[in-house]
Regions:
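Detector for outer-membrane/organellar transmembrane beta-barrel domains
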Residues: 95, 107, 111-233, 240
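Outer membrane beta-barrel
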Residues: 1-87, 92-112, 178, 199-215, ...
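Internal helix-turn-beta structural module
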Residues: 245-276
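Strand-connecting loop/turn motifs
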Residues: 13-15, 72-74, 126-128, 165-169, ...
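Hydrophobic beta-strand residues in large extracellular and virion-surface proteins
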Residues: 18, 131, 170-174, 207-209, ...
């Protein structure tokens, strides 16, 4: 059994909150959206930050640590310190993982549980335009027991949702991230036979656009979308995937049906996989 979240929450004021325990590391927007509010189906075809892998630096974007966060007017800030990579992989000095995010809401202020974000609100929060920058860093945050290396990453993202005059909703999200590590899947430590926590070194970008039709058809509304993802490692060839999809939104994030066609060779490692063309039908149900 996996423990996803286990934390103490000290919530003094909207501008000052402290979460301590096993919790989500401040990340870029796809990381804070999670899989349950995504407008697209295949969003995890890009390289991840270290805690996002199911490995020694965290699980599902979580690690043990603390996050100071809050909202002041239109500014939203996150400052975190975490355990990050374990000493079994070369972090013998127990260097910590530092993570931070600063976002600014130019129009309506986004409202979510805690410091999470969403990939679409289906127009329920009005007109939104948010930009953000994210940083993560850990000395000895990659490599092996015999030969450790550092991890550093930054990301920029933008999110816009606009309710049009016909009550339709246009949603746009885009982001760019760059990850700098000493050891990668393609360039592991040469002087060691130990297991390696090797990541991606390079840059990645994505963009998603969708439109929610205003008129209901039966119990739901149709939302066509397109998403493009591109990965550019420094030690291998580039890869990309394009996804065309159609959501049938019945009850927001609680109930929807997805049909999508995806073409390309991008995957979560950041390195090119098989070049495939797939058609997927999915059902999202959440009870809360």
């Amino acid at each position: 059994m996996m423990t996803i979240d286990a934390l103490l929450r000290f919530e003094f004021d909207p501008s000052v909150n402290l979460w301590v325990g096993r919790t989500l590391v401040p990340s870029d927007r796809p990381g804070l959206n999670g899989p349950y509010t995504g407008m697209s189906w295949n969003q995890y075809r890009q390289p991840l930050f270290s805690a996002d892998y199911d490995g020694p630096a965290g699980q599902l974007g979580r690690s043990e640590g603390a996050v100071l966060w809050g909202m002041k007017n239109k500014f939203h800030y996150l400052l975190g310190v975490f355990e990050g990579l374990e000493d079994d992989y070369g972090n013998d000095s127990d260097h910590l993982l530092f993570a931070g995010r600063l976002a600014y809401n130019f129009l309506n202020v986004e409202s979510n549980p805690g410091y999470y974000t969403s990939a679409t609100y289906y127009g329920t929060q009005g007109n939104i335009f948010t930009t953000a920058v994210t940083l993560q860093s850990q000395s000895d945050g990659t490599g092996s027991k015999a030969e450790s290396g550092d991890f550093f990453a930054y990301a920029f993202d933008v999110f816009s949702e606009r309710v049009l005059s016909n009550s339709g909703v246009f949603t746009f999200e885009a982001g760019y991230k760059e990850i700098d590590v000493d050891f990668t899947l393609a360039s592991p430590p040469t002087a060691s036979t130990d297991k390696c926590f090797c990541l991606f070194d390079g840059d990645s970008l994505y963009a998603t656009a969708g439109y929610l039709f205003p008129k209901a058809v039966g119990p739901g509304k149709f939302q066509p979308y397109v998403r493009y993802m591109e990965n550019n490692p420094n030690d291998a060839g580039s890869s990309d995937t394009t996804e065309w999809g159609l959501n049938y939104v019945i009850a927001g994030n609680k109930a929807s049906i997805n049909l999508n066609y995806a073409s390309g060779d991008a995957n979560a490692s950041g390195y090119a996989g098989n070049d495939t063309d797939t058609v997927t039908i999915g059902l999202m149900l959440q009870f809360y």
